[in-house]
Amino acid sequence: MIRKNIIKNKNDKQRYFLNDSWRIEMPAVVRTPFYGNNCSEYFGYVVTYSEMEQAYHLLKVDLHNGKILWSIDAVNGGYGTPTVFGDLVVFLKEFDAVQAVSAESGIVEWAVQGGHRVRTTLNVIDETLWFGSGSTLLAVNKNGEVVKKLHIPNSFIYGNITPYKGGILCTGTLHNNERDCSCSYLWLINQEGSIMYSMELGRSPVISSDTSGIWLKDDFAFASCGHDIICFDLKVGKELWRTRVFGFCGRHFPVVDSQRVYYTTLKGEVGCADILNGSIVWRQKFREGLIVAPPSIYGKTLFVLADCSVFLLDKDTGEI
């Protein structure tokens, strides 16, 4: 497990490089670290998988030195990045439930059964925790009580759950009778459970991940499906543009700044498209092959995780 400091480039304050803060050998495979909304400078959390024990563990870590403050078993911790929900840490329990533990002590506080497979992220919206179970979205309060259920008949919901103008945006699959196949969709649902509109992303084998779903910017949603990057105008529920890229990009959403859209693919391509029309600005091919996570933007730097390495790219040009 590694913590690196982000250091400013002396010649350009908007570009950065990394150096080690600390590095600790772990007797397990380390998954994605995560933090609370306030991005505490003191504590972080991580899920690990021990092949020897064949078990997942949820750990609380001191960010100053990497010391493990507590560790608990996390059944099915391998899917779905956990989240911090006030003074609780919530993660998936088995395949169809979520469980909350005290962020202070790691003691179990409550669990909520969804009844069907959970393939969404865990999302905190207006002091409630939202997740999807099969074709249903559930909202849970800090006491572990289900306070709302929204249903999309015959669907399977996956990816992130995003608030938009009092409603909820989510993605999922549904059988398209006209095309006689399963297609991915983007839905906007109001708080009463009515589907305001449904937008087809396209025919695609679903390979969902912790970063599937959409990127929301103002009144525009950016999504990926198969080999396509797609932009939707949410004010009218209409697709604005669609761009084909090299490799499967539907596993995770693109990321967006004020002018451009950045994507990665399972063929090892990192690319940048114009936010207005989807035209490709630059492409970069990595010999590492599979890139299974979206890039991250920090200043003028684009962070890309490819295989076992983190690459820092100039986001304007794509140069490493």
Predicted regions and their residues:
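A short beta-strand motif characteristic of beta-propeller blades
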Residues: 20-26, 67-72, 107-112, 145-151, ...
